[in-house]
A protein has these predicted regions:
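Structural signature of nuclease core domains in nucleic-acid processing machines
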Residues: 1-276
Length: 276
């Protein structure tokens, strides 16, 4: 995406495969000299999965109103030592009331944006790539778990107004980049069958139909953590996957409170293994 830009959407399968080969070969040459047989096998597996993953991302971008605008975006007020000109967003800073400051720093895998001039807003979606199985559970966020993606999202909403005028949280999604293979009944298979691999996405989205529909324009449920009625097109499972602006604000404020509590405990010498 970074190298091909908008042209990435129109690459043929053969061109995608060639791009993967070039990128993997480049990485191996720079980082993995003298590979073992086992490592060579694992690299081959990575190549195959990347071809499928990029195909999925192509399908997503072809139908989505959102566009990737940043990759590995640093949230930090200090320049990167290796690349001082790299784009970055200032972190949120919270005061604990005792003279200490909490700074939220990190790196966002991908940021997608959809400007809506009529509303004077730029809606932002954070995409967090994960391997294996990863399920977003909002109830765990309230206990201080699985907070990273939302912390990044709320940081962008508060501190990325210069880069993205009217920055507004549209949601965050985990993209399972190396999911477990799906079980398929052999009776459903044919010699010609070669279904495109799917990569589950789950997370929390803004409860605004025009926004989540822009992420999945045909209502397939393939690109958002939602199920749509085949008859009405309405969302069926919205309780834990959609939140209106007021609810997102409450979640943001709750996370701020958790971070301040953590800081107070650390400075007081209370470092229990919680929550576990």
């Amino acid at each position: 995406l970074r190298r091909r830009g908008e042209a990435f959407k129109t690459l043929t399968p053969e061109e995608v495969e060639a791009l993967v080969d070039a990128l993997v070969d480049e990485y191996v040459a720079e980082n993995l000299p003298g590979m073992t047989v086992r490592m060579d096998y694992l690299i081959g597996r990575i190549r195959r999965n990347l071809v499928g993953l990029l195909g999925f991302i192509q399908r997503d971008l072809r139908q989505s109103g959102f566009r990737p605008v940043a990759f590995e975006l640093r949230i930090d007020d200090r320049p990167d030592a290796e690349n001082p000109d790299a784009p970055r967003i200032d972190p949120v800073q919270l005061a604990d009331g005792a003279g200490h400051t909490v700074r939220i720093v990190g790196t966002v895998d991908r940021v997608d944006a959809m400007p809506l001039e009529k509303r004077g807003k730029t809606y932002l979606r954070v995409v967090d790539y994960k391997t294996g199985g990863k399920e977003f559970k909002l109830k765990e966020v309230y206990y201080g778990l699985d907070c990273q993606m939302l912390l990044y999202l709320f940081t962008l909403e508060r501190n990325a107004q210069t880069a993205f005028p009217g920055a507004t949280a549209a949601g965050g999604e985990y993209l399972l980049a190396d999911p477990a293979p799906e079980s398929v009944d052999r009776r459903e298979l044919t010699e010609e069958a070669d279904p495109a691999p799917t990569y589950p996405m789950n997370g929390l989205l803004l409860d605004d139909e025009s926004i989540y529909r822009a992420m999945d324009t045909k209502g397939t449920g393939e690109f958002v953590p939602l199920s749509f009625s085949a008859k009405t097109g309405k969302v069926l499972n919205s309780k834990s996957t959609l939140a209106d602006e007021a609810k997102l604000g409450r979640i943001r404020d709750h996370l701020d409170g958790l971070l301040i509590d953590m800081a107070e405990n650390l400075y007081s010498g209370r470092i229990d293994a919680e929550p576990l």
